[in-house]
């Protein structure tokens, strides 16, 4: 096997290689990691499942160009430094969520409070996406919300936190469950 065709990520939880179809991150892990940017060489990855309370310090979530990815499930309280409503409300928003160019991605689920202190949410060129679920207080502090490259509309954007108008636009496109108060 050519070294250029086989790559891997090794950590205390195991190995993810270029032939993995599923990546399961156990609850409470990877809390010292400052970003999650999955490399394009994980070209066979079909499913990403992140357990509760993971990536507590991560300020970047980026998935770009994973051609086989079909499903992303992120459980509650992930990618958020603060863990309760009062702290999230008062925390500076400084994280970035980006998911782009995953032509087979159909399902994205984010659990309660995940990404609560992120400032940017972008979904680009995800033509197969039909289910988007955002749990309670997800992306609560997010002033930049962008959805582009979906059919039949080519560009849907909201530049403030989710509003009823954004929810109406999104419900035409996919099933969206939001519980922002």
Where are these regions (language model features)?
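Intrinsic disorder/low-complexity segments
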Residues: 170-173
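N-terminal segments that cap or nucleate solenoid repeat domains
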Residues: 1-51
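A short, polar/proline- and glycine-enriched secondary-structure boundary/capping micro-motif
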Residues: 83-84
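Concave beta-strand-loop units of leucine-rich repeat
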Residues: 25-31, 49-57, 65-68, 73-80, ...
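Leucine-rich repeat
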Residues: 10-16, 35-41, 61-64, 88, ...
């Amino acid at each position: 096997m050519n070294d250029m065709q086989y790559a891997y990520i090794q950590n205390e939880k195991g190995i993810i290689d270029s032939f993995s179809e599923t990546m399961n991150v156990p609850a409470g892990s990877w809390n010292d990691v400052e970003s999650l940017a999955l490399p394009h060489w994980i070209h066979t990855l079909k499913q990403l499942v992140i357990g509760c309370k993971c990536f507590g310090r991560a300020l970047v979530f980026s998935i770009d160009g994973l051609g086989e990815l079909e499903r992303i499930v992120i459980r509650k309280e992930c990618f958020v430094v603060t863990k309760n409503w009062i702290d999230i409300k008062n925390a500076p928003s400084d994280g970035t969520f980006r998911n782009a160019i995953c032509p087979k991605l159909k399902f994205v689920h984010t659990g309660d409070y995940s990404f609560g202190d992120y400032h940017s949410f972008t979904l680009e060129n995800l033509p197969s996406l039909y289910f988007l679920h955002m749990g309670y207080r997800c992306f609560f502090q997010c002033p930049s919300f962008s959805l582009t490259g979906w059919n039949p509309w080519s560009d849907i954007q909201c530049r403030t936190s989710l509003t009823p108008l954004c929810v109406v636009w999104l419900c035409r496109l996919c099933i969206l469950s939001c519980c922002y108060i």
